[in-house]
Every structure is written in C-alpha cells, then in structure tokens.
Amino acid sequence: MKVEFDKIPDESRIWIYQSNDDFTESDVDIINKKSDLFVDNWMAHNKELQASFKILNNRFLVIAVNEEFNPIGGCSIDYSLQLLKDISDTINKNLLDRLIVNYRMGSII
C-alpha cells in the first residue's frame, strides 16, 4: 500500500539506488509510473507493505518500507530488485551498479 513518502516513519527501512546519469523528464515519468504501481501492490508473506518512493536530485531513487506496519522478507526485497532491473532496462540507465560513487560539489552532483 502506497503512502506519502513524508508519512513513512524515520525508523523505516530504506534503499537508495543511484543512477550513472541524471534522469530526464521522460525517465522520471517512467520511474514514477513503475514505482507507483510497484509500491501500491508490494507484499510480504501475503500481507501488504506500507511503502513509498522518492526521486532525489534527479539521480537517486529512494524506496522506503514501514516495517512496523508489516515486516519485509527476502523474497519481497528480491522482487524490488526486479523493479530496479526493469526501470534500468527501460530508461537505459544503470541503477544497480554499486561501484558508482556520487558526490556533491557545490550544487552539482
């Protein structure tokens, strides 16, 4: 079940995925549509997960789950990786490369 990102408790579990390039407007639309559908239907052990997502600085996708509502399991986390692979393939940007390091220099990331 999707909730507003700002309503997710601070103690929630989060994953931050970074892109190898800035998201275009089209990328953001695709990410929003796919992520919206995903978090609205995301489940663990046949129980709804209270989840949300946010795009930050046109380069990061943040996914959050309120584990106080229902705990997340390994299969559900794996399912989220399928979403990331799908988004990466669709927008032709790598969101799963752990060797990418982003940093801020002034207002530039």
Label each region the model flagged.
Residues M1-N58, E67-E68, D78, D89, ...:
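Polybasic/polar functional segments that serve as interface/processing modules
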Residues N70-I72:
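Short, cysteine-centered beta-strand-loop-beta hairpins and adjacent loop/turn segments enriched
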Residues G74-L84:
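"Short basic amphipathic alpha-helical interaction patches in structured regions
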Residues D86-S88, I108:
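Non-catalytic alpha-helical scaffolds and adjoining flexible linkers that form interface surfaces
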Residues V101-I109:
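Short, conserved secondary-structure transition motifs
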